[in-house]
C-alpha cells in the first residue's frame, strides 16, 4: 500500500469526491465509525480494515443524537490530534471529522429506528440511544459507501442492530465484528474508562471477572440462563462500588431473553461503577 499522507476531511462533499476517485481506480473502501478518543480496541478495528480494503476511512464524530439529555456528551473525552496519529500509524487513508452542523441540519427530522432489537438491554435505560446510532451509521454508510464497515463486539447490541438494519434496508455493506480488546488485567477497553478514579478502576474489574465466570460456566456445560445470570450477579454484587443496570442472556440475533444457553447467545451486562456506566459481554457461538 502506498504510504500517502493521510487526509483529514471535514465535509460530506470532500469525502464523496475522494471516494469517487478511489472507486474510479477500482479500489475497495472500508469504514471504521468511531466517536473519537481512540484506544487499542479501535486500533484493532482499523488494522482489520486496512488488511481487508485498499482504502480505509475512519470517522471521528461524537454523535450528539445518541446521548440522552442527562448523559455524558459534554464530559466525553476528546483528543483529535492523537486520534489522527493513531489512524495514520495504522495506515488509514482518511479521517472524516465533521461538525454536528455538517451532519444535522437545523430542521433535520428523519430517523432510522428499530422496533424490537433496540428496546432491550441498553435500550431500556437509554431509550433514544439506538435511534441515534442507526441514523448516524446510515448517514455514514451513505456518505462513504464502503464495501465493509467495522464494529467492536464490546458494543454487541449495537453490532446486532447494525447487522439487522443492513439486512432489513438492503444496504450493500459487509459488517465485520471484531473481538473485545482488554487491558492486561481483563477490563474491556473503553473511552469511558478515563472517567474512573484509581479505586473505581480496581472495582471495574468486577465486570470482566463476572464475564469470565459466566463464560467458564457455559464452557463447563451449564445451559441454564438463570443459573449463569445469578452467578454473575452474585459476583458483581460482591463489589460494593458496583451497581447493576442489567445482566441478561439474549438471543444473539433477536436480542430477546433466552432461558437456555445455546448458540448464538449474547450474555451482556451494564454496571455502574460510581457514576460511570460500563458494559461487557461474552458471546456463545
What are these model-derived regions, one by one?
Residues 231-285:
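Phosphate/ribose-recognition catalytic cores of enzymes acting on nucleotide-derived substrates
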Residues 3-241, 250-252:
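Nucleotidyltransferase catalytic core that binds NTPs
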Amino acid at each position: 500500500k502506498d504510504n500517502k499522507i493521510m487526509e483529514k476531511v471535514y465535509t460530506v462533499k470532500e469525502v464523496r469526491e475522494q471516494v469517487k476517485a478511489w472507486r474510479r481506480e477500482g479500489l475497495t473502501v472500508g469504514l471504521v465509525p468511531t466517536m473519537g478518543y481512540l484506544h487499542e480496541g479501535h486500533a484493532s478495528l482499523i488494522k482489520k480494515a486496512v488488511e481487508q480494503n485498499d482504502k480505509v476511512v475512519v470517522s471521528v464524530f461524537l454523535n450528539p443524537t445518541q446521548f440522552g439529555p442527562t448523559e455524558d456528551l459534554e464530559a466525553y473525552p476528546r483528543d483529535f490530534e492523537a486520534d489522527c496519529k493513531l489512524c495514520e500509524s495504522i495506515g488509514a487513508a482518511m479521517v472524516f471529522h465533521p461538525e454536528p452542523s455538517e451532519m444535522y441540519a437545523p430542521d433535520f427530522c428523519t430517523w432510522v429506528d428499530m422496533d424490537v432489537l433496540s428496546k432491550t438491554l441498553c435500550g431500556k435505560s437509554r431509550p433514544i440511544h439506538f435511534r441515534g446510532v442507526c441514523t448516524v451509521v446510515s448517514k455514514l454508510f451513505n456518505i462513504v459507501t464502503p464495501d465493509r464497515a467495522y464494529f467492536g463486539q464490546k458494543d454487541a447490541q449495537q453490532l446486532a442492530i447494525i447487522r439487522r438494519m443492513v439486512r432489513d434496508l438492503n444496504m450493500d455493506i459487509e459488517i465485520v465484528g471484531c473481538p473485545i480488546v482488554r487491558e492486561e488485567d481483563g477490563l474491556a477497553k473503553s473511552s469511558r474508562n478515563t472517567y474512573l478514579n484509581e479505586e473505581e478502576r480496581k472495582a471495574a474489574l468486577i465486570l470482566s471477572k463476572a464475564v469470565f465466570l459466566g463464560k467458564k460456566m457455559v464452557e463447563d456445560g451449564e445451559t441454564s440462563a438463570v443459573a449463569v445470570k445469578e452467578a454473575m450477579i452474585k459476583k458483581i454484587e460482591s463489589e460494593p462500588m458496583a451497581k447493576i443496570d442489567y445482566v441478561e442472556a439474549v438471543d444473539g440475533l433477536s436480542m430477546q431473553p433466552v432461558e437456555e444457553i445455546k448458540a448464538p447467545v449474547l450474555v451482556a451486562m451494564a454496571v455502574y461503577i460510581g457514576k460511570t456506566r460500563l458494559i461487557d459481554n461474552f458471546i456463545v457461538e
